[in-house]
C-alpha cells in the first residue's frame, strides 16, 4: 500500500480535495486554530499596510494538510493584492521564475509550494529578487554573454514546505517572517468540520462533528475528507443526518479507529507487539514482516505514530510504547 491509497494520508491531495477551496477561510478573522500564527500575522499585515509596504517574505512550514496554501491566500486577501501560485518542481529553469517575477505588480504575493525542491540554478535567481527586488539575467552565450539587471516591483514571496531542514541557509535567511503550523487541537477541528458541514448543506450534530474531529489526526485536510465519506454513509444507510453514532459507524467501516489509525498503522504496531514482543526490531526486519518498503515505513507510517507516542525509534530499533499495548487491550510485559 502506498501513501496515495490511504484515506488518512495528508501528504496526498485527492481530486475531491480541490472542492475544499470553496470552504476555506478567506480572511484572518475566519481562520481557526494556530492562535500564535494568527495573532502575529495580523500585526505584520496591519503594519505593512500602514506603511504602504509589501509584506516581508514569509516562510510557512509544517506537516502536510495543515493549511499552508490557505494561509498564503489569506495573506493576499488581507493585503488586497494578487496571488500568483507555483511550486518548486515546476520551476525547472531560471527563465521560468524570471517570467513569473516580471509579471508581478507592486506588493503582489508569489506563492511557491514545496520550495525545498527548487533547483540550485533557480534558487540563485531568487536571492537578488528577494533581497534587492532585482533580477539578474544573462543575455547571449560565450564571449558575447552579458548580464543585465531588471528592477522588480516590491513583492512578497511566500514559501511553503514540509521539510524546513532541507532549505539552504542562504534561502532560509532571506525570509523575514517564519511561521510553523502545528497539528490542530480537537475543538478547533470540530469547529472546522461543523463549518464545512454547513457549507455542504449537511445536518450534523455537534457530537457528530466531534467524532470526525477526533479521528482526523489533527489535520483539517483529513477532517474534510472523512466528513465527505461520513456524508456518503449517512445518505445511503440513513436519512442523511450525521450524529455521533452514525459518524462512528461510518469511520469504523472505513477502518479509521478512535486514534485516527488505519489498517496499515495497526498492522505495523501489531507486528512490533506480536512478532517482536514489543521490540526493539530493526527496520529491515519490520519491513519484511509487514510487506512494505523501508522508505514507506520511515516516511509515511512512522511519523504520526512517533508523534503521538505509540512508537519509539531507538538506536537498537523500533519499540512499541505502553500506549500502543494499551490501545490494543494487550498487557505490556513487565520491565526487567
Curated annotation (Swiss-Prot):
Residues binding DNA, per UniProt: 294, 313, 318
What biological-process terms (Gene Ontology) are attached? recombinational repair; response to UV; SOS response
Superkingdom of origin:
Bacteria
Question: How does its activity get regulated?
Answer: The ATPase activity is inhibited by the ADP product.
Residues covered by region (Head domain (RuvB-H)): 258-336
Provide GO CC annotations from the record: cytosol; Holliday junction helicase complex; Holliday junction resolvase complex
Give induction info: Part of the ruvA-ruvB operon. Expression of the ruv region is induced by damage to DNA and is regulated by LexA as part of the SOS response. RuvA and RuvB are also involved in mutagenesis induced by UV and X irradiation and by some chemicals. Induced by hydroxyurea.
For activity, the cofactor(s) needed are: Mg(2+)
UniProt comment concerning the protein's domains: Has 3 domains, the large (RuvB-L) and small ATPase (RuvB-S) domains and the C-terminal head (RuvB-H) domain. The head domain binds DNA, while the ATPase domains jointly bind ATP, ADP or are empty depending on the state of the subunit in the translocation cycle. During a single DNA translocation step the structure of each domain remains the same, but their relative positions change.
- Effect in UniProt of substituting residue 220 to S: Defective RFR, UV light resistant, variably resistant to MMC
Question: Region Large ATPase domain (RuvB-L): what ranges?
Answer: 4-184
* Subcellular locations according to the entry: Cytoplasm
Q: How does it assemble?
A: Monomer in solution. Homodimer in solution. Homohexamer. Forms a stable RuvA-RuvB-Holliday junction (HJ) complex in the presence of non-hydrolyzable (d)NTPs; in the presence of hydrolyzable (d)NTPs branch migration occurs. Two oppositely facing RuvB hexamers sandwich possibly 2 RuvA tetramers at cruciform DNA structures. Homododecamer composed of two hexameric rings; when bound to DNA in the presence of ATP-gamma-S and Mg(2+). Forms a complex with RuvA without DNA. Forms a complex with RuvC without DNA.
Residues annotated to bind ATP: 23-24, 65, 68-70, 131-133, 174, 184, 221
Quick check: keyword RNA-binding in the entry?
Answer: no
Q: What happens when the gene is disrupted?
A: Sensitive to radiation, filamentous growth after transient inhibition of DNA synthesis, little effect on conjugal recombination in wild-type strains. Increased sensitivity to mitomycin and UV light. Suppresses lethality in recB-recC and dnaB temperature-sensitive mutants.
Q: How is the cofactor bound?
A: Branch migration by the RuvA-RuvB complex requires Mg(2+).
Catalysed reaction(s) here are: ATP + H2O = ADP + phosphate + H(+)
Q: What is this protein called?
A: Holliday junction branch migration complex subunit RuvB
Q: Which positions are annotated as binding Mg(2+)?
A: 69
- Origin species, per record, is Escherichia coli (strain K12)
UniProt similarity note: Belongs to the RuvB family.
Query: Under which EC number(s) is this enzyme classified?
Result: 3.6.4.-
- Region annotation (Small ATPAse domain (RuvB-S)) maps to 185-255
Instruction: Using the UniProt record, name the top-level EC class of this enzyme in a single word.
Output: hydrolase
Question: Gene for this protein?
Answer: ruvB
